């Protein structure tokens, strides 16, 4: 254990402050509890991310023994009900007190069916959901940015996996998401309402393929509303019920809506 601890300290000395731990549930729980506590004595700012896609009870225990952040089932939550139910579980139950989710649409090991068959729109959908539902999110970089969706037939694995071959990525490939991802990340950085997971509220929309939710800063100074079309194959439309009463806006009062993705502004 001491030798393994020395490895972590070596990388901390090189400036590393975030450790993604692969499959921590396959190692003894007492080891992780001891190691994380030892590291935090000197470096309380170090983050340990649990990369464990396993049973809920095991994922929760890893969070309780010290992992700051955890992988989740977001990767496989695609419908309106699936996403809503899961977010309520994460943000409105006792799990909120110890489990900090980190949303990943894909990983080097996992290419979910939604991305395999939904084309570029599916990648856009999952990116926006991950970036706006959770304060913490990540992507397996070039494969996601270039919308790579070729899978091993019948499996959720990349057909030509970077794990087994050296890739020469064409970052300017047609259809890439570079600028879109940069825009979304800029919006997250500039808007404090998106920098926490616990302020999430779902709102009414009359279409099962549209997900409508919002986040607000604690002081009420900023409100972000997000609408996502969960259907990667078709354009969808619907009527939203804007919660103007929460924002102190009277029904007969016009207000400014700023579309942060397009930078367009509207008077509603």
Regions found by a protein language model. Give the residues of each.
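Structural preference for beta-strand elements that scaffold enzyme active sites
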Residues: 16-20, 45-49, 68-70, 100-103, ...
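Carbohydrate-interacting/catalytic domains
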Residues: 33, 41-42, 60-66, 81-95, ...
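Aromatic/acidic polysaccharide-binding cleft in carbohydrate-active enzymes
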Residues: 102-108, 114-175
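Conserved, mostly hydrophobic/aromatic
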Residues: 11, 21, 48, 108, ...
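Active-site neighborhood of glycoside hydrolase catalytic domains
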Residues: 1-60
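A structural motif corresponding to the C-terminal end of an alpha-helix
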Residues: 10-18, 96-97, 133-136, 187
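The substrate-binding groove and active-site-proximal loops of carbohydrate-active enzymes
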Residues: 1-2, 16-26, 70-78, 107-120, ...
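Acidic (Asp/Glu)-rich catalytic clusters
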Residues: 12-13, 89-103
């Amino acid at each position: 254990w001491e030798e393994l601890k020395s490895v972590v300290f070596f990388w901390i000395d090189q400036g590393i402050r975030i450790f993604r731990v692969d499959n921590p549930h396959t190692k003894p729980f007492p080891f992780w509890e001891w190691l994380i506590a030892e590291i935090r004595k000197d470096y309380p700012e170090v983050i340990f991310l649990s990369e464990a896609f396993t049973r809920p009870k095991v994922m929760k225990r890893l969070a309780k023994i010290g992992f700051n952040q955890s992988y989740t089932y977001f990767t496989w939550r695609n419908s309106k009900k699936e996403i809503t139910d899961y977010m309520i579980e994460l943000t409105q139950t006792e799990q909120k007190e110890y489990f900090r989710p980190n949303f990943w649409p894909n990983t080097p090991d996992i290419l979910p069916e939604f991305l395999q068959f939904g084309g570029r729109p599916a990648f856009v959908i999952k990116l926006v959901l991950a970036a706006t539902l959770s304060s913490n999110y990540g992507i397996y970089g070039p494969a996601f940015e270039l919308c790579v969706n070729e899978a091993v037939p019948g499996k959720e694995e990349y057909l030509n996996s970077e794990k087994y071959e050296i890739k020469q990525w064409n970052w300017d490939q047609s259809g890439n998401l570079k600028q879109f991802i940069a825009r979304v990340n800029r919006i997250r950085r500039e808007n404090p309402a998106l920098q926490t997971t616990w302020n999430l509220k779902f709102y009414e929309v009359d279409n099962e393929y549209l997900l409508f939710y919002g986040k607000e800063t604690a002081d009420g100074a900023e409100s972000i509303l997000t609408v996502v079309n969960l259907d990667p194959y078709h354009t969808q439309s619907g009527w939203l019920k804007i919660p103007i009463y929460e924002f102190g806006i009277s029904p007969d009062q016009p207000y400014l809506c700023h579309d942060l993705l397009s930078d367009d502004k509207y008077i509603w």
